[in-house]
């Protein structure tokens, strides 16, 4: 991650942004900033407002009110809306949208303004970008001669060609099959990072955001619930809904015993407490916090469990265990010889999360 290399001044600042479609509000008081060189993922389910937010930043949708600043320049505000073509942003959508009558070279040249790329400076820039995105050998091909992944690489190259301040990408990998999606995603993100560019991705793919983002903004019903690093959002989210959205979870009613411990059906569990004063709430645990083995890390709790079901999945084994009448599924990379009905110790690692 390149956060230590970034300058403190934000590249993009969004302040109190709202958007209505007729009477329906689709963006609610959105505020966040993006630093130079940072890659942000807007993560949420379909219809949550993330694409509308991206289009508002690009200038394709006009917000109802609020402000958008790029560097120290206002691009949207009260009685002011800078045209899209003057914002100096790159935009990549799901299926690339290349010009069918232009070859790869001229599609990229179009990103520089005239679609020709004939002068030496433009030729050098186009060749650099084609090398960076791995499409140099495709320069003379037309879009119908390209695979879906190649088309997306060309779309990214075209967006990068004018060296934009920021690139916006709306679900750029969703139209590709799974194997190709993984390959193209990795190549495109590597190209973005090598170019030193800043980017905002729209995605509904949680694993994609966790793996590749510098920061993730959780978008739900037109609001940003939380924006933070992937690790913080997974292990220390501010809200229960965010915690559940970020990964598989075990949620149980619980009561605080003291500031650092809660009692639930499993037993007494050390917790990170997100409640200021309330004693009753819920505790959230991740399945991977449970193990049948001692590790170098001291466990935070120890339970007695009984195996109810075993599912072998190759490199991992899923095991259903009953603890104090409550059944959970855990996954172990290496499992000893186990049988249904076995009684054995179950170790909990890391603290649970308590929410009132």
Predicted regions and their residues:
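ABC ATPase nucleotide-binding domains
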Residues: 88-90, 94, 98-241
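ABC ATPase nucleotide-binding domain helices that frame the ATP-binding cleft
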Residues: 51-54, 154
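Helix-to-loop junction immediately C-terminal to a conserved catalytic motif
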Residues: 58
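Conserved ABC transporter NBD signature motif
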Residues: 66-77
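Non-catalytic connector elements of ABC transporters
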Residues: 249, 260-356
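The feature captures the beta-strand-to-loop junction immediately N-terminal to the Walker
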Residues: 43-45
